[in-house]
Amino acid sequence: ANMQVLSTSKSGTSLNAQSVSGKGLDLRTISPDNIESMEVIRGIPSVEYGNLTSGAVIIKTRSGVTPLEVKLKADPFSKMAYAGKGFLISEKMGAMNISADYSQSYADIRKRYNGFDRITVNLGYSNTFMKSSRPLTFNMRLAYYQNINSEKTDPQLKQDEKIKNENMGVRFNLEGNWRLNTSWISSLGYSFMVNYSHQQDYRREQIILQSGITPVANSYVSGEYQTYFLSSSYYSDYTVDGKPLDVFGQLKANKLFQFSSDCFMTLKAGIEWKYNVNRGDGMMFDPKLPPVVNDIQSIRPRSFKSVPAINTLSFFIEDKAQLPIRKTTLTLQGGVRLSNLFIDKSAGRKDMFMVEPRINMEYNILNGDNNKVFDDLSIVGGFGIAAKAPTLLYLYPDK
């Protein structure tokens, strides 16, 4: 739901290097020292994962009991300070994990006004209920992040030019697994996430028109209108105010059929829902002093509140089987993912329905049990379709 751009109807160019609009999650809001594990899924992923094109990266932050850690780092491009600890409340009450960090980075040290300064505070709680019967794992994480030193200036900037970037947000995650071990279901996994932030980018810059005095159009509908002319040089003040809200929920069930120690089959089925909306004031500037002007099209102020929310509902089912063939092993995995993107009628088009079948095969020929040279030699192949839905940035462009 990040829409921090000058115009969604033109190139979608971001306001400056601070924005990741249309590019996915801003990894700068995640503390690297608070990461517990990182899984890279290459090739054709499971149908459990959707809205992607080539693989996925699964990041899990720390939880449970961890020793006290204090870290300091400095190099020409970045500075970082981190402190964190996880402690056990009690055997019944579970464990708590607390951490905080500060980070400063420059993609280009020659452009200090494009630097990034942020603080992050993380709070995590984990516990396992009903340990002796049907264990239910519960992991809750709450993160707060905020930019500091948001107002930037630099001797390289022209006189009276200013840059200001503000980003403050809260991220809540809840996930776990319930081992039911019944005749029809082995385990039930759940995941829920809410991410809300307030982003505000302000810039004052000098606009110089190479074509000299230029007419500007500011109407929202086609037709003939009286307009005005811009001078060849002027200062433009513009602000992009965004309040993106992203909600994600997933529920999946697993059933394990164990035929022998090395022969089994696992069935997986689940449902997933995503909701994306932006309630910011959007692009704000004086129409008589626009930040971008050309002979073809000019941009206009637009509130993000006028952009409808996106709802995506998905279902998936998958079967994975491992079959021993003498001293070799054949693993087959196949499934399908069905997704429907609900589009508002104002977009002038119907909902988007996506079908994503995926198949993977791995035949392990050599291993430590049948030879003394190779630890692992396998033939891997597969076929799959992955669909990535358009974001709010591109689905509802301004007129």
Give, region by region, the residue ranges found by the protein language model.
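Transmembrane beta-strands of outer-membrane beta-barrel pores
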Residues: 74-78, 102-106, 142-148, 194-202, ...
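Short acidic/polar hinge/loop motifs at secondary-structure boundaries
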Residues: 2-41
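Extracytoplasmic loops and strand-loop junctions of Gram-negative outer membrane beta-barrel proteins
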Residues: 19-23, 40-41, 65-68, 104-109, ...
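N-terminal periplasmic accessory domains that precede
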Residues: 1, 24-28, 48-72, 87
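Structural signature of Gram-negative outer-membrane beta-barrels, strongest in the C-terminal barrel
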Residues: 303-399
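Face-selective signature of the C-terminal outer-membrane beta-barrel domain
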Residues: 129-145, 165-348
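Transmembrane beta-barrel wall of Gram-negative outer-membrane proteins
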Residues: 69-104, 111-193
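Outer-membrane beta-barrel translocator domains and adjoining extracellular loop/strand segments
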Residues: 84, 108-115, 147-159, 200-211, ...
